[in-house]
């Protein structure tokens, strides 16, 4: 497909999405929920064919030398498919927010003014590796009354095509236009350039992937962008804290799964608890094969314990390590003077995604919540909870690190906007 044909192709997708968006925006909640339930059933019924398509992607990606963490993201297990099927059913069970009027107040003139929640219209989703995003994005589009154009990574093209075909089938079975969810069927990068430059059809772009992708989209897009940046998440172990709880959380936040963007990449430890805490967590990390990139103070403490030093992979940290999203069994470790230095470090080096404090001090917890400039800030909980399902959103289309429109996990409400509605009884302005 040459550049001219790609431009025509994307214009066609845009027009079809815009037309479909008007129909799905006014669809009753029962119809949208029926489509979601249909999709959940189809995912379960087609498990074998979906995994066969995914296997073709995995084999091609492995032969091309795709890195281990990205291969992990590409894989569609039976558990992954059941999770997205359950997500569709959970969305179907959630209240429909479209048409909801909030903040209705009577003004001195007698008019009543409020805001109605309405669909955005058409969103374009650009994402890498994870084929389950196809279902997450499609299901949220359906529930929120939007249309969407999906452009997944070339490494997942077979998986995405198989999943998108089921979405279209579910929509048609429910009496909704199949074009409400469309997958860009070419892996040519020119399609991305076209998608982000169609303001006449696309109302917002949501890129989800590496920093290079996000920066390119943000720079070149001619429509608004909701950014899902990388996840350089931190856990800060405060003085005072419950050491046993801190060890449990720091272990889970890093090792429960390495590839998600909400996995912890940086561990900050208050000097007052470092001698008690660091040897315990280092023993766990060492047993699980986690490389520890330590500042001088942390390394000094760990080297003083021969039993740990003999099994642990302790490496001097560089300045770049404080910025790094590893997506791998690697963690940076730094000893800090206290909560203020921890906050300053996080605000300087983090990606403003998710950061947690583990503490017994209420004032420290409140200061951390107020001053850490991240989309999700936690007290005494694992960063792995930064997820739409865990936050009760039913599903998420990404975790926005922006400060406008949507911040944190973007669920149904993040895919809507508010318009003012005015109710009068014949009032005129004097």
Swiss-Prot record:
Taken from the UniProt entry, a GO cellular component term is: cytoplasm
SS bond partners? none
Q: Does the keyword Cytoplasm apply?
A: yes
Q: Which UniProt keywords apply?
A: Amino-acid biosynthesis, Cytoplasm, NADP, Oxidoreductase, Proline biosynthesis
This enzyme's EC code(s) = 1.2.1.41
InterPro entries noted in UniProt: Ald_DH/histidinol_DH (IPR016161), Ald_DH_C (IPR016163), Ald_DH_N (IPR016162), Aldehyde_DH_dom (IPR015590), G-glutamylP_reductase_CS (IPR020593), Glu-5-SA_DH (IPR012134), GPR_dom (IPR000965)
State which pathway it belongs to: Amino-acid biosynthesis; L-proline biosynthesis; L-glutamate 5-semialdehyde from L-glutamate: step 2/2
User: What CDD domains would the database entry show?
Assistant: ALDH_F18-19_ProA-GPR
Role played: Catalyzes the NADPH-dependent reduction of L-glutamate 5-phosphate into L-glutamate 5-semialdehyde and phosphate. The product spontaneously undergoes cyclization to form 1-pyrroline-5-carboxylate.
State the NCBIfam families in the record: PRK00197.1, proA
Give the protein's recorded name: Gamma-glutamyl phosphate reductase
């Amino acid at each position: 497909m040459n550049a001219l044909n790609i431009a025509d192709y994307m214009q066609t997708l845009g027009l079809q999405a815009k037309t479909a968006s008007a129909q799905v925006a006014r669809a009753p909640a029962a119809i949208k929920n029926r489509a979601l339930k249909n999709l959940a059933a189809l995912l379960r019924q087609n498990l074998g064919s979906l995994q066969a398509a995914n296997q073709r992607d995995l084999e091609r990606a492995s032969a091309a030398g795709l890195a281990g963490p990205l291969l992990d993201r590409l894989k569609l297990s039976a558990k992954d498919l059941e999770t997205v099927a359950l997500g569709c059913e959970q969305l179907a069970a959630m209240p429909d927010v479209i048409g909801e009027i909030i903040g209705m107040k009577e003004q001195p003139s007698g008019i009543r003014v409020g805001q109605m929640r309405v669909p955005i219209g058409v969103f374009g989703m650009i994402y890498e590796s994870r084929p389950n995003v196809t279902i997450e994005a499609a299901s949220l589009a359906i529930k929120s009354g939007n249309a969407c154009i999906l452009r997944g990574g070339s490494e997942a093209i077979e998986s995405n095509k198989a999943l998108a075909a089921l979405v279209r089938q579910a929509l048609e079975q429910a009496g909704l236009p199949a074009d409400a969810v469309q997958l860009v069927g070419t892996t040519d990068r020119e399609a991305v350039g076209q998608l982000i430059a169609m303001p006449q059809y696309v109302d917002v772009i949501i890129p989800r992937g590496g920093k290079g992708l996000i920066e390119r989209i943000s720079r070149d897009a001619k429509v608004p962008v909701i950014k899902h940046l990388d996840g350089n998440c931190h856990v800060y172990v405060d003085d005072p804290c419950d050491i046993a709880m801190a060890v449990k959380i720091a272990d889970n936040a890093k090792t429960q799964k390495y590839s998600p963007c909400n996995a912890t990449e940086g561990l900050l430890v208050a000097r007052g608890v470092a001698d008690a805490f660091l040897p315990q967590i280092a023993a766990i990390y060492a047993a699980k094969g986690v490389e520890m990139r330590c500042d001088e103070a942390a390394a000094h403490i760990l080297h003083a314990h021969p039993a740990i030093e003999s099994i642990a992979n302790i490496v001097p940290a560089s300045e770049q390590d404080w910025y790094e999203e590893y997506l791998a069994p690697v963690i940076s470790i730094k000893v800090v003077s206290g909560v203020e230095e921890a906050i300053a470090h996080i605000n300087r080096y983090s990606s403003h995604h998710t950061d947690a404090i583990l503490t017994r001090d209420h004032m420290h917890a409140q200061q951390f919540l107020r001053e850490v400039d991240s989309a999700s800030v936690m007290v005494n909980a694992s960063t792995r909870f930064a997820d739409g399902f865990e936050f009760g959103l039913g599903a998420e289309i990404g975790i926005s690190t922006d400060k406008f429109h949507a911040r944190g996990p973007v669920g149904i409400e993040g895919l809507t906007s508010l318009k003012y509605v005015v109710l009068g009884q014949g009032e005129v302005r004097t």
